[in-house]
Amino acid sequence: MNGRGSHSASATTKSFQRLNFEKYEAILSDLDGVITKTARLHAAAWKRLFDDYLQRFTAKTGRTFKPFDLEEDYRVHLDGKPRQDGVRDFLKSRGVSLPLGSPGDHADRETFYGLGNQKDRYFDSALEKTGVDVYPGTVEFLRLAKRSGLKMAVVSSSHHCAQILDAVGLTALFDVRVDGHEIDRLQLPGNPAPDGFLEAARRLVVPPRRAIVIEDALAGVEAGHAGAFGLVIGVNRRNQADALRDKGAHIVVEDLAELLPGRTEPSSSPPR
């Protein structure tokens, strides 16, 4: 037990569906790793950025560094966070400090923002080459919720959110979008602070206790818990179910298709 709410294995998908469509008014969903299979592209872009940067840093200083780990470093330091915060946290783990800079920094500037902007260039290149796939279970679940009358918001630290939603034909699914551009414009703190999700709930005119947060990132689940949202669903894409629960997820699923009518029982129960 983590102290962030009791979990029971007695909940069935049927009971969860009843809560979904009668108790709650809105869904606030992350994008990368929940709706679209773009998390791996982000991780690869970060690896390209940091491995190159640390090699150049080694050439200048003689210090050596452990290369970026696609699984552990992405999950712990970057997933779900604004770019500049992720750059700061990863470099701190390697004992490197840089100035914050500003959002408009050129990609060759050695600042948190500058490196983040270079990462976006790498991501754009990968996206153009590979395209975007969705998680069908997520799309089916969100469309069912929309048809059932729930308001919908996408909340993402990504600056590519609108572009990706358009590419997969899901723009019209959402009533509100709070993405990296909006987070920068409003100067909101990123995950694990709840401000992005709270802003989405405010725009939807839905109190947090009546909204569901869906996240695959530990920092995002922590944000949902910090915002006192009525239900936080953790999507376990990286074999971290226990960690998602520890951060405050009420329910953890491998795929949101598990929560569709007639599917199997979720791994823990929603709050009553």
Question: What are these language model-derived features?
Answer:
Residues 17-136, 147:
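N-terminal helical cap/lid subdomain that shapes the substrate entry/recognition surface
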Residues 152, 231-232:
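Hydrophobic beta-strand scaffold residues
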Residues 175-176, 230, 249-250:
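Receiver (REC) domain switch/active-site residues of two-component response regulators
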Residues 235:
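Conserved acidic donor-binding loop of glycosyltransferase catalytic domains
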Residues 131, 150-151, 155, 159-212, ...:
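Substrate-recognition "cap/lid" segment bordering the active-site pocket of phosphatases
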Residues 1-29, 105, 264-272:
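Non-catalytic pre-domain segments flanking phosphatase-related domains
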Residues 45, 86, 137, 160-164, ...:
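Phosphate- and divalent-cation-binding pockets in alpha/beta enzyme and binding domains
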Residues 251-256:
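Short acidic-hydrophobic, aromatic-tinged amphipathic segments that line or gate anion-handling sites
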